[in-house]
């Protein structure tokens, strides 16, 4: 027989197992599983004979291996024989007598009533511990009987509804009825000297005394300590008034020189809202600001304000390039701020000061306080409420300012075009770039900004410029 080329075979695998080999392997697996759950050695009907086979003494069957016997024990025949054997043994077994119960003999006697009693409440003078003293009279107690006692809870008795606040102390002695005393349900102190009983055989009196344990007084409730950094709630109000705020740890040192103490900071919450404008410190006590001294102008020339230095003679800054707008409203000169609200322009007919000469301070305007910082270098301060005007030489009517990119003449040299005469003496020319206006017309309204000058390419030509001054149009591609 060819064992190498059988169908389904694989070289080196030993060939395909036959059906008998598969059954043998299956039975061995089942036997191993049965041995894990059933101990064959403890089976009273399992027996191995001298031939090496296995027998069932209950069913008288023969088995070649352990697996066969285990399969037999789970079969119907073996289970039926087990039930029949159990019924037979139960029928033949003798009936065993039931165990006798221990019987307690109940004493039978005629009750003659309740005994007399006396209860005394006591308190320890040193510790304040409470106690009860019971005295029970048994004059007709039976011979050889000693009174007995016990504590009973409220749930053991059947006379009253159970109440956990009370307990009962029972006293019993023949032939008297059992009596009970209702006491508070507190822990009993059974230490030596705190709980004792005494039976006097001569007087036939029974004494019992016990003490209640001391109850610790409840501690005052204390606020729990919160985590660090968390403040405790404020104390309650006393008489409807909040407690005083804590005093500061240290007061600020007194100022030197005997000056008055600064005001204390307010203890209430800080006021909310935007901060106000900065205020100047008040003048020292007893010092009044000097009154303004106004001198009359001499021959149309206004003197400068006190403390103001005039510019150096012969130094004139270049005139700025200002294009007059097309409308009839002229902007102020460069560097000249429009008047603040509430400050009116000069009345008509009042001439501005000459170049380089500063106007006097207005009447009713106080000079600056000594705490005002000095002006920046090369800037001359003016009286309060009056804005400075740059010292610019006026130009004759019809003379245009230099174009952008053209350097001004050197300081001290003032070229004049031919045919233009300087103004007569005593007549003050207007500021550069500012055209005189008729009386009753204000130079600018407070709070109204001048219009932005238009570039030369967009504004219309002025009559003074003439057709020759119009810039050429931009080249086209």
From Swiss-Prot:
The modification Phosphoserine is found at residue 153. Gene3D superfamilies: 2.60.40.2690. GO terms for biological process: mRNA splicing, via spliceosome; spliceosomal complex assembly; U2-type prespliceosome assembly. Pfam families: SF3A2 (PF16835), zf-met (PF12874). Component of the 17S U2 SnRNP complex, a ribonucleoprotein complex that contains small nuclear RNA (snRNA) U2 and a number of specific proteins. Part of the SF3A subcomplex of the 17S U2 SnRNP complex which is composed of three subunits; SF3A3/SAP61, SF3A2/SAP62 and SF3A1/SAP114. SF3A associates with the splicing factor SF3B and a 12S RNA unit to form the mature 17S U2 small nuclear ribonucleoprotein complex (17S U2 snRNP). Identified in the spliceosome 'E' complex, a precursor of the spliceosome 'A' complex. Identified in the spliceosome 'A' and 'B' complexes. The keyword Acetylation applies. PANTHER family: SPLICING FACTOR 3A SUBUNIT 2. A zinc finger (Matrin-type) spans 54-84. Keywords: Acetylation, Metal-binding, mRNA processing, mRNA splicing, Nucleus, Phosphoprotein, Repeat, Spliceosome, Zinc, Zinc-finger. Component of the 17S U2 SnRNP complex of the spliceosome, a large ribonucleoprotein complex that removes introns from transcribed pre-mRNAs. The 17S U2 SnRNP complex (1) directly participates in early spliceosome assembly and (2) mediates recognition of the intron branch site during pre-mRNA splicing by promoting the selection of the pre-mRNA branch-site adenosine, the nucleophile for the first step of splicing. Its main location: nucleus. The modification N6-acetyllysine is found at residue 10. It comes from the Eukaryota. Residues 1-27, 217-477 are annotated as: Disordered. One of its GO terms (cellular component) is nucleus. SUPFAM superfamilies: beta-beta-alpha zinc fingers. This is Splicing factor 3A subunit 2. The gene is SF3A2. The modification N-acetylmethionine is found at residue 1. Residues 217-295, 303-323, 331-362, 399-441, 448-477 have a biased composition (Pro residues). It is found in: Nucleus. Residues 379-398 have a biased composition (Low complexity). GO terms for molecular function: nucleic acid binding; zinc ion binding. Belongs to the SF3A2 family.
């Amino acid at each position: 027989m060819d064992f190498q080329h059988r169908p389904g075979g694989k070289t080196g695998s030993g060939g395909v197992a036959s059906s008998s080999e598969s059954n043998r392997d299956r039975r061995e697996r089942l036997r191993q599983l049965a041995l894990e759950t059933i101990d064959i050695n403890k089976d009273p009907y399992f027996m191995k004979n001298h031939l090496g086979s296995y027998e069932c003494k209950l069913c008288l069957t023969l088995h070649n291996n352990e697996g066969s016997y285990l399969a037999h024990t789970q079969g119907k025949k073996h289970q039926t024989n087990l039930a029949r054997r159990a019924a037979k043994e139960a029928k033949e077994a003798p009936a065993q007598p039931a165990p006798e119960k221990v019987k307690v003999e109940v004493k039978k006697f005629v009750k003659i009533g309740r005994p007399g009693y006396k209860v005394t409440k006591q308190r320890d003078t040193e510790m304040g511990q409470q106690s009860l003293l019971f005295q029970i009279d048994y004059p007709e107690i039976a011979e050889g009987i000693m009174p007995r006692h016990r504590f009973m809870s409220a749930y053991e008795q059947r006379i009253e509804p159970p109440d956990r606040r009370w307990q009962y102390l029972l006293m019993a002695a023949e032939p008297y009825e059992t009596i009970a005393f209702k006491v508070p349900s507190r822990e009993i102190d059974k230490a030596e000297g705190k709980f004792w009983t005494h039976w006097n055989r001569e007087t036939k009196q029974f004494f019992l005394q016990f003490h209640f344990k001391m109850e610790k007084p409840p501690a005052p409730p204390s606020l729990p300590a919160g985590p660090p950094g968390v403040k405790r709630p404020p104390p309650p109000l006393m008489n409807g008034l909040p407690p005083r705020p804590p005093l500061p740890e240290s007061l600020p040192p007194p100022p030197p020189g005997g000056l008055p103490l600064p005001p204390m900071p307010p203890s209430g919450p800080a006021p909310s809202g935007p901060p106000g404008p900065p205020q100047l410190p008040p003048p020292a006590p007893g010092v009044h600001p000097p009154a303004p001294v106004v001198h009359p102008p001499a021959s149309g020339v206004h003197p400068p304000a006190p403390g103001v230095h005039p510019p150096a003679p012969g130094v004139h800054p270049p005139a700025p390039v200002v294009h007059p707008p097309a409308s009839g409203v002229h902007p102020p000169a460069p560097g000249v701020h429009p008047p603040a609200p509430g400050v009116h322009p000069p009345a008509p007919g009042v001439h501005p000061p000459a170049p380089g000469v500063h106007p006097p301070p207005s009447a009713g305007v106080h000079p600056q306080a000594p705490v005002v910082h000095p002006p920046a270098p090369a800037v001359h301060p003016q009286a309060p409420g009056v804005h400075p005007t740059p010292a610019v030489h006026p130009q004759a009517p019809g003379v245009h300012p230099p174009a952008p990119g053209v350097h001004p003449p050197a300081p001290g040299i003032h070229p004049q075009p031919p045919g233009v005469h300087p103004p007569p003496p005593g007549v003050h020319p207007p500021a550069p770039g500012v055209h005189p206006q008729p009386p009753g017309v204000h130079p600018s309204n407070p709070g109204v900004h001048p219009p932005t000058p238009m570039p030369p390419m967009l504004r219309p030509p002025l009559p003074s410029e003439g057709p020759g001054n119009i810039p050429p149009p931009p080249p086209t591609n």
